[in-house]
Structure formats: structure tokens, C-alpha cells
């Protein structure tokens, strides 16, 4: 194939080596050697075509007589393409849409690499900014959509009690158990639950003190009987909570898909497993090793602290923040991993002969981790001047690395906290019994959907407010 392959399809004299281009009515005559400077572009490949079929694959129409190639493209953008063929550089005017321009040069087979330096920074900045805004907007939209789904599911669950025996009574009991702050009864129940959780955690902590341990027949430390009474009362209360919520749940299958209910279940399962293991060990001494399993399960009591999430807006908001901020959290971990890897190797190279605590790279990982997170236990410290300078750089880098993603995560947290407060306020304001009496001729699902739409409007206005409106004191409640 030669550069004259195109001319073989026409009898017209081509000694001038020119072709005619018509782009949406914008006509120009171009010399072949100008186009062949860039053979990978659409017009450059057009000159190398040796059949009409190949030509029509690259343009929209072709006139054999006039040797005119027609392209159904935007004629206002083609002058920029034409300028590229003459100068080898692309320029982007400020009034142009960068995405339309990007699609246009992609059609002509021109790489963004040819954008001149005077326009490159502005072009790529304008192109990335909407994508970043779209990412943040999509993340907020997903979180807000989940709120709408959550409140709609709440109304749907409440409607399932209609027509059931004692339906209104069960609904009020369900609201009192599952929504702290819904009524006076729910507030009292919530306070009692919090006190029992805190009492159980405090008891577990005090039981680890030697002064409160009573040796058994074999001399092993055992629990104080008074603490066992508190523990058994706590288990009885937690079991009552779980059974009561399950008994009045509108959807039993959905009940076990709720993370808070799974936490309630996991808070009592270790106790009953431990009870069974102890009975088995007592009846069969050969299975004494199972006692270690019981000891491990007893340590799982600390997870009861998660039960407070049912009564704390801040904890639930934290959980939602971690769920929808996985990109920011991943970015934070990536930054820390890179910094730890670099500074641990540097510290190892400098201190391996002078400091036994930094004699291996894994040991330096620990040092770099506590330094970058600004914890600084002080168990391992560099001794040389170069090592101390490295430690200073590691700490400063850690501050910068941690602060940048934390700002994004806090903005997410403030958004979820305000949203959760709004949801709780909406749930507390619901009076299903009175509301249904006021609209006897309206379908219940339509009625609930109408309420959801009103809530959606308020949530949208709330999400547009500034994150700075949230005070640090409020986030702790």
C-alpha cells in the first residue's frame, strides 16, 4: 500500500495532491503531505485507503467527481482539528465543553497528548472536576437513597400489623422496642437497656482484677459470685429483649437481616455456648480442652458494647459513614501503607547496626506505624542523628497523610448524623393509629408513600446544608 492508494479510485487529475473536506458544511482543501504527517489519525488513514468501501468506513459520504469527503460532525470544532494538522498542537478555548471536545478529537483519532502545554493543565482540570463532583454526588445520592428505602421499609413494616389480632397493640410495642425515643415507654426501656449493657461491661472489667477473683478448688482464679449474679441478670435481660423484639417483629426473615438484631444475638450466644461446654466438660473429663473454648467465648462479652448502637445516633452514623466511605478509608490505608513501607526500610538501613529494636524490617514496620499515626509508644526509638531525622520526617508525613482523608470522612459523618436525626424525628412524629383514621378511603401504601415523599423533600434540604453546622458535642450523642 502506498500513499497514492487513494488516487487509484478516481480518474481525476491529482497532481496538486489535494483533497476536499466537508465537515457539516465547513469546506477546506488540504494537501496530502499535511495529513500524512499524522498517519494514525482519521484523515491520515483516509489517504491510505485503496477502495471505496474502505473510504466510507472512515467518512460519511464520498464524491468521486469532486473528490470531496463529507463528515457529519460539528463544524464549529473542526477548525481546532485543522489547526492541529498545520501546527501539530491542539489548543482548547475556555468556552468549549471539554467533554464534547474530547469526543471530537477522539473521533478524528487525535490523542490528548497533543494538547499544548498552555491548555493542557486547564483542560485536564476541567475534565476531572466534574468527575470528582459526580463521585461525591453519587456517594451522597446512594446514602440518601438508602435513607428513603429505610423509611419506606419502616412504613411498610408498620402497615403489616393492620388486620392482625391485636395489631395496633403489637405495632405500638414494636415501635417502643425498636425505636428509642418514640414514646415514654420506649425511652424508659432504652435507659434500662443501656444501664444493663454498661453494668455487664463494668462487671467483666472488674472481674479481671485479682482483688475480685476467688480461687476454685484447683487454685485457678474464678469469678466472684456477686458478679455472676449480675452476669446472669444481664443475659436474662438481653434474652428477653431479643425474644420480645422477635415476637412483635412484622417480618421474621427480615428480623435476622438487621445488623442490630444480629448484634443482640451475638451478645448472648457465647454465654449459652459456654454453659453447654461447661456441662459437657463436667460430664466427660476427657473433653477438658473444651474449657479453653469457653474461656475464649467469655471474652466475646466485650462485643456487647455494640448494643449501644441501637440507642446512640452517633454510633449508627459512624457505621453508615464507614459503609459509604470505603473509598476514603481505602485511600487512608493506602497512604499509610506506602509511608510505612518507605520509612521502615529507611530506618532499617540506618539503625540495623546500632539499634537492636530496629534490626529487622518487620520490627521497623511497627515503629513506622506508631510514628505515622502519631501514637509514639516510645518502646523503640532511633539512636542515630540520621535515624532521628528520619523519625521526624515520618511523623510529619503521618500527620499530612492522616489529616487529608479524615476531612472527607468527617464531612460524610456530619451528613449521616444530620440525616439520622431527621429520620428519628420523622419516626417519632408518626401516629399510625390517628393518621389511618383520618384517611379511611386511601390505600395504606399510598398514604405511607405520601409521607415518604414529604420526608424525602426535607432530607434533600437537610443534605444541602453546610457540614460545619454540626457541632462536635452533638456528634457524641
UniProtKB/Swiss-Prot annotation:
Short sequence motif Selectivity filter: positions: 374-379
Question: Encoded by which gene?
Answer: Kcns2
InterPro entries in the cross-refs? BTB/POZ_dom (IPR000210), Ion_trans_dom (IPR005821), K_chnl_volt-dep_Kv (IPR003968), K_chnl_volt-dep_Kv5/Kv9 (IPR003971), SKP1/BTB/POZ_sf (IPR011333), T1-type_BTB (IPR003131), VG_K_chnl (IPR028325), Volt_channel_dom_sf (IPR027359)
Organ and tissue specificity: Detected in brain, but not in the other tissues tested. Expression was highest in the olfactory bulb, cerebral cortex, hippocampus, habenula, basolateral amygdaloid nuclei and cerebellum.
**Annotated GO CC locations:** perinuclear region of cytoplasm; plasma membrane; voltage-gated potassium channel complex
Q: What is its main location?
A: membrane
Q: What is the lineage of its organism?
A: Eukaryota, Metazoa, Chordata, Craniata, Vertebrata
**What UniProt keywords apply to this chain's record, in alphabetical order?**
Cell membrane, Ion channel, Ion transport, Membrane, Potassium, Potassium channel, Potassium transport, Transmembrane, Transmembrane helix, Transport, Voltage-gated channel
Protein name according to UniProt: Delayed-rectifier potassium channel regulatory subunit KCNS2
Q: Where in the cell is it found?
A: Cell membrane
Amino acid at each position: 500500500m502506498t500513499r497514492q492508494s487513494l488516487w487509484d479510485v478516481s480518474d481525476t487529475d491529482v497532481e496538486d495532491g489535494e483533497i476536499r473536506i466537508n465537515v457539516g458544511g465547513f469546506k477546506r482543501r488540504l494537501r496530502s503531505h499535511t495529513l500524512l504527517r499524522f498517519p494514525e489519525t482519521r484523515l491520515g488513514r483516509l489517504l491510505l485507503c485503496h477502495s471505496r468501501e474502505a473510504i466510507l468506513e472512515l467518512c460519511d459520504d464520498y464524491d468521486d467527481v469532486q473528490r470531496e469527503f463529507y463528515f457529519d460532525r460539528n463544524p464549529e470544532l473542526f477548525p481546532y482539528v485543522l489547526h492541529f494538522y498545520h501546527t501539530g498542537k491542539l489548543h482548547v478555548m475556555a468556552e468549549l465543553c471539554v467533554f464534547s471536545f474530547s469526543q471530537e478529537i477522539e473521533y478524528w483519532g487525535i490523542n490528548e497528548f497533543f494538547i499544548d502545554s498552555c491548555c493542557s493543565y486547564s483542560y485536564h482540570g476541567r475534565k476531572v472536576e466534574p468527575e470528582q463532583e459526580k463521585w461525591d454526588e453519587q456517594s451522597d445520592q446512594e446514602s440518601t437513597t438508602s435513607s428513603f428505602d429505610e423509611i419506606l421499609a419502616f412504613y411498610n413494616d408498620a402497615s403489616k400489623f393492620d388486620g392482625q389480632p391485636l395489631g395496633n397493640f403489637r405495632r405500638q410495642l414494636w415501635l417502643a422496642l425498636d425505636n428509642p425515643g418514640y414514646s415514654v415507654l420506649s425511652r424508659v426501656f432504652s435507659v434500662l437497656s443501656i444501664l444493663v449493657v454498661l453494668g455487664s461491661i463494668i462487671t467483666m472489667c472488674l472481674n479481671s482484677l485479682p482483688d475480685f477473683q476467688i480461687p476454685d478448688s484447683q487454685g485457678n482464679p474464678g469469678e466472684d459470685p456477686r458478679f455472676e449474679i449480675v452476669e446472669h441478670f444481664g443475659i436474662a435481660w438481653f434474652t428477653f429483649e431479643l425474644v420480645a423484639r422477635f415476637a412483635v417483629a412484622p417480618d421474621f426473615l427480615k428480623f435476622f437481616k438487621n445488623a442490630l438484631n444480629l448484634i443482640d444475638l451475638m451478645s448472648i450466644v457465647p454465654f449459652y455456648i459456654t454453659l453447654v461446654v461447661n456441662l459437657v466438660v463436667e460430664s466427660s473429663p476427657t473433653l477438658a480442652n473444651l474449657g479453653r473454648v469457653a474461656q475464649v467465648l467469655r471474652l466475646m462479652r466485650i462485643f456487647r458494647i455494640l448494643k449501644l448502637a441501637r440507642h446512640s445516633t452517633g454510633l449508627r452514623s459512624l457505621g453508615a459513614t464507614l459503609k459509604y466511605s470505603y473509598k476514603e478509608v481505602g485511600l487512608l490505608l493506602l497512604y499509610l501503607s506506602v509511608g510505612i513501607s518507605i520509612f521502615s526500610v529507611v530506618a532499617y538501613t540506618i539503625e540495623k547496626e546500632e539499634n537492636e529494636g530496629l534490626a529487622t524490617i518487620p520490627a521497623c514496620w511497627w515503629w513506622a506505624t506508631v510514628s505515622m499515626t502519631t501514637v509514639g509508644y516510645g518502646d523503640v526509638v532511633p539512636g542515630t542523628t540520621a535515624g532521628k531525622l528520619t523519625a521526624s520526617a515520618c511523623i510529619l508525613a503521618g500527620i499530612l497523610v492522616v489529616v487529608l482523608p479524615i476531612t472527607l470522612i468527617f464531612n460524610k459523618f456530619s451528613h449521616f448524623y444530620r440525616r439520622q436525626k431527621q429520620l428519628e424525628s420523622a419516626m417519632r412524629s408518626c401516629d399510625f393509629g390517628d393518621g389511618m383514621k383520618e384517611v379511611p378511603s386511601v390505600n395504606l401504601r399510598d398514604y405511607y408513600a405520601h409521607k415518604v415523599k414529604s420526608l424525602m423533600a426535607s432530607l434533600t434540604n437537610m443534605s444541602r446544608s453546610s457540614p460545619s453546622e454540626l457541632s462536635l458535642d452533638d456528634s457524641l450523642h
